[in-house]
Regions:
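Bacterial N-terminal signal peptides
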Residues: 8-17
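N-terminal helix-cap/turn-to-beta initiation motif at the start of protein domains
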Residues: 22-36
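Edge beta-strand at a domain terminus
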Residues: 24, 132-134, 140-157
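Short polar/acidic secondary-structure junctions
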Residues: 30, 43-45, 116, 127-129, ...
């Protein structure tokens, strides 16, 4: 009787320890939310296009372009010719393109995203996918139905 009870407690302890280890090995990326470095993928070529650093400031998320993957023949530090106002003519590297996203359940909403290729700003919402390895980024005008979705991949380097 005592041996059976001891075996039961030992089994329960082992089960709990195993569960704790499994949780400990869960991706830290999901725990951090969308903050960190993300590789954007070109819609047409399916090749990496840029690295965006998403950071939190005063409870809101922002994203800044850290790096561009460009052909060696192209300008390696282009400026935003199509942007308006203070951003016109500014270097794209270092530019904040995601602004003011607030946590709303499993996604971050209420912010905006700038497309330096056309200089336009869109409403934006983002959500983690695949255990925090991917980021679904939706830019839209008016309603979320009228927009475009990209999937960014968490940067490894």
């Amino acid at each position: 009787m005592i041996a059976t009870r001891w075996f039961g407690l030992a089994s329960l302890t082992l089960l709990l320890a195993t569960s704790a280890l499994a949780e400990d090995k869960a991706p830290a990326a999901a725990e951090n939310g969308p903050t960190g470095r993300w590789t954007t993928i070109d819609d047409e070529t399916k090749k990496p296009k840029s690295v965006i650093v998403i950071y939190e400031e005063n409870g809101k998320l922002f994203g800044k372009i850290e790096k561009l993957f460009r052909d060696p023949k192209e300008d390696q530090n282009p400026v935003c010719d199509k942007c308006e106002g203070a951003l016109k003519g500014q270097p794209i590297i270092g530019m904040t393109i995601l602004q003011n996203l607030k946590k709303d359940d499993d996604e971050w909403t209420g912010g905006s995203i700038l497309d330096p290729a056309n200089g336009k700003t869109y409403k934006c919402k983002i959500a983690l996918e695949d255990g925090g390895k991917k980021l679904k980024v939706r830019g839209y005008i008016g309603m979320s139905l009228l927009g475009r979705t990209q999937h960014w991949v968490r940067a490894t380097e």
